[in-house]
A protein has these predicted regions:
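Solvent-exposed coil/turn segments that connect beta secondary-structure elements
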Residues: 69, 182, 403, 425-427, ...
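Glycine-rich beta-solenoid repeat tracts in large extracellular/virion proteins
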Residues: 15-21, 38-45, 62-68, 92-100, ...
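C-terminal, low-ordered peptide segments at domain boundaries
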Residues: 384-417, 478-486
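Short, small-residue-biased leader/transition segments that mark boundaries at the very start
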Residues: 2-7
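PDZ/PDZ-like domain segments forming the peptide/carboxylate-binding groove
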Residues: 399-444, 448-451
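Acidic, glycine- and Ser/Thr-rich low-complexity intrinsically disordered tracts
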Residues: 73, 175-176, 180-193, 276-399
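PDZ-domain C-terminal substructure recognizer with occasional recognition of PDZ-binding tails
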Residues: 437, 443, 449, 455-486
C-alpha cells in the first residue's frame, strides 16, 4: 500500500547521481552541491550499495532517496481517501518482487541546506525499500524532515547515531524523523480502521515485516516533533535517543516500543491509540504532562517512567497508567555542552531503571566533515509548573475550544491552527450527537467563518431564532456541510 512516491507526494526518479540495478557500489568522499533536484537516487533494485563520507548541500530537492518499484506493493492505494476493499485485498506478507533497494547504507555524510525549490523533501527518503541503515549523518536546515520513512513497506531499517536539527522550517505537522504508515490495514476513517484491525490482525505487520529501529540519535525540532510516527506507523523500536525539544508523537499504529529516551522539556504525544495497540512507553525521562488526543487504550505498558515534576506524574496517574513510575529531581551532567546524562547515583538510575548512553557520538565522523558540521542549540532544562486552564465552551452537550495546538492540528489534519475544535460530545445527553463528533473542527456557521470561539459564540447567538443551523465541519481530511435542527 505504501507508495511514498505517489501517495503523499510525487517524486522524480532522478538525481545528480543515480543508482539503478547496482550491487556493492559506493559513492564515497564526494561533494554534491548546487543541484536543482535530488542529490543521490537509489531507484528500484539495489543491493549492498552506499553513500559514505560525502557532503551534500545546496540541493533543490531531497539529498538521498531510496525508492522501490510500485509494482512490489500489494493492494496499493494512491490517494488519501482511497482504500482497497478487504474482499479484493492481497493479504500475503511482504513484497511481490525484489525490485527495490535493500541492505544499503547512508553513513558519515553531512547533509544541509536542502529543499531549495521542492519543499516536500527530506535528507534521507526511505520508500518501498528494506534494511537500509542510516547512521552517523549530520542533517540540518531542511524545510521538512531530516529522515522520512514514507510507509511501512517493508521495514528492517536502522536509524542510528544521527545528529538532526533545524528541520520542518517551511512546513508543519511533521517531525525531525518522520514516518507515514498507511499500510494495508490503514484507512482514513478511524472507526473503519479499528474494525479492520480487530477482525484482521495479521494485516498489521503484512507490510512492515521487520521492525524499524531508531536509536542513539540527537534530534531537535522547533516546529513539530523530534520523532513523529504518523498515520498508523507500526513495528518500531525507539530507544536511547536524545530529544531536545519536540517530544515523541505516536499516532494510530501498533507495536511501538519506546524506551530509555531523554525527552527534554517535552513528553509523549499519543494520538488516536487503539485499544490493543501493543505499544510500550517505559523508562523514559519525561519533563511535561502527556498530551493525549483520542486515546482509547494505553497499549501494553505505559509505566516505569521518570517524571521531573509531580504535576506531570499525577496527570499521568489520572490517565490510568504509570503505576510504578517515579518523580525525580533530574540534574543533567552538563546540559549546556550537550551532556544530558544523569549522575550514576541519581534516582532516575537507582529507582527508575534509566540507563545512560553516549552523548559524544552523534553525527559525522570524518575529520573534514566534523570541521564543517554545525551542532544544535542546547535547550535549558525546565521543570513544568502550573499552566492556566484552556478556555472551553459548552453548547448542547458539546465541549469546544480553540484549535490552537500543534497536537490538535495533527490529529485533525488541519492546514493551520484555526477553527474551533470539538473536545467531547455527551453521547447520551447531547441533542446534536448525531451531527457533531469529537475531533471535528468547526470552520463555519450559517455561512460565517469561524476561526475562534468568539466567532462561534456570535454566530450561534444569531442562529437561536432559527429552525436549523448550518455548520461547516472539517472531518476525515474533508470539509462537510452539516445541517442541525434546533
Amino acid at each position: 500500500r505504501g507508495l511514498g512516491d505517489v501517495y503523499k507526494r510525487q517524486i522524480y526518479r532522478g538525481g545528480a547521481v543515480i543508482f539503478r540495478g547496482t550491487e556493492k557500489c559506493t559513492l564515497r568522499d564526494c561533494y554534491i552541491h548546487h543541484v536543482g533536484g535530488n542529490g543521490v537516487f537509489f531507484d528500484k533494485y539495489n543491493r549492498n550499495s552506499a553513500v559514505t563520507g560525502s557532503y551534500l548541500t545546496s540541493i533543490g530537492a531531497s539529498a538521498i532517496c531510496f525508492v522501490g518499484d510500485v509494482a512490489g506493493v500489494r493492494s496499493p492505494s494512491f490517494r488519501y481517501g482511497e482504500f482497497v476493499p478487504l474482499d479484493k485485498m492481497d493479504t500475503a506478507k511482504g513484497s511481490q518482487n525484489d525490485n527495490h533497494p535493500a541492505y544499503c547504507e547512508v553513513y558519515d555524510n553531512l547533509i544541509c541546506t536542502i529543499g531549495l525549490f521542492e519543499k516536500q523533501i527530506t535528507g534521507v527518503e526511505l520508500s518501498m525499500c528494506r534494511n537500509i541503515t542510516v547512521s552517523h549523518n549530520s542533517i540540518y536546515d531542511t524545510p521538512r524532515a531530516g529522515i522520512n520513512i514514507s510507509e511501512g513497506t517493508w521495514g528492517g531499517h536502522i536509524i542510528e547515531y544521527n545528529d538532526i536539527f533545524n528541520t520542518v522550517k517551511e512546513t508543519g505537522d511533521h517531525g525531525t524523523i518522520n514516518s507515514w504508515g498507511r499500510d494495508r490495514f490503514w484507512h482514513p476513517n478511524y472507526n473503519v480502521m479499528t474494525q479492520i484491525t480487530d477482525e484482521n490482525p495479521a494485516l498489521i505487520l503484512a507490510d512492515v515485516v521487520e521492525p524499524i529501529i531508531i536509536r542513539h540519535n540527537r534530534l531537535r525540532c522547533d516546529r513539530g516533533w523530534d520523532i513523529d510516527l504518523d498515520d498508523g506507523s507500526s513495528n518500531y523500536q525507539i530507544y536511547n535517543n536524545l530529544c531536545l525539544n519536540g517530544g515523541i508523537k505516536l499516532r494510530e499504529g501498533f507495536y511501538r516500543t519506546v524506551e530509555n529516551n531523554i525527552i527534554v522539556n517535552n513528553t509523549l504525544h499519543p494520538h488516536l491509540w487503539f485499544k490493543n495497540s501493543g505499544d510500550v512507553f517505559s523508562r523514559n525521562i519525561v519533563m511535561t504532562k502527556y498530551k493525549p488526543i483520542r486515546v482509547y487504550g494505553w497499549g501494553r505498558e505505559v509505566d516505569y517512567n521518570i517524571f521531573t515534576d509531580s504535576l506531570s506524574y499525577l496527570a499521568a496517574r489520572q490517565l490510568g497508567g504509570d503505576a510504578h513510575s517515579i518523580v525525580a529531581a533530574i540534574r543533567f551532567i552538563d546540559a549546556a555542552k550537550g551532556d544530558f546524562n544523569v549522575a550514576d547515583d541519581s534516582e532516575a538510575i537507582i529507582k527508575g531503571g534509566f540507563r545512560n548512553f553516549p552523548m559524544n557520538n552523534f553525527g559525522v565522523l570524518s575529520f573534514h566533515l566534523k570541521q564543517l558540521a554545525e551542532s544544535p542549540v542546547m535547550p535549558v532544562p525546565l521543570v513544568a509548573g502550573h499552566v492556566t486552564d484552556t478556555k472551553t465552551m459548552l453548547w448542547k452537550g458539546v465541549t469546544f475550544k480553540n484549535l490552537d495546538t500543534l497536537e490538535e492540528r495533527s490529529a485533525t489534519g488541519m492546514d493551520t491552527e484555526r477553527g474551533v475544535y470539538v473536545v467531547s460530545v455527551d453521547a447520551l445527553g447531547s441533542p446534536v450527537r448525531d451531527f457533531i463528533a469529537p475531533n471535528d473542527v468547526v470552520l463555519g456557521i450559517n455561512r460565517k467563518s469561524v476561526n475562534k470561539l468568539s466567532d462561534m459564540k456570535e454566530a450561534l447567538k444569531r442562529a437561536d431564532t432559527q429552525k436549523e443551523v448550518e455548520f461547516i465541519i472539517f472531518r476525515n481530511q474533508k470539509e462537510h456541510k452539516v445541517v442541525i435542527p434546533l
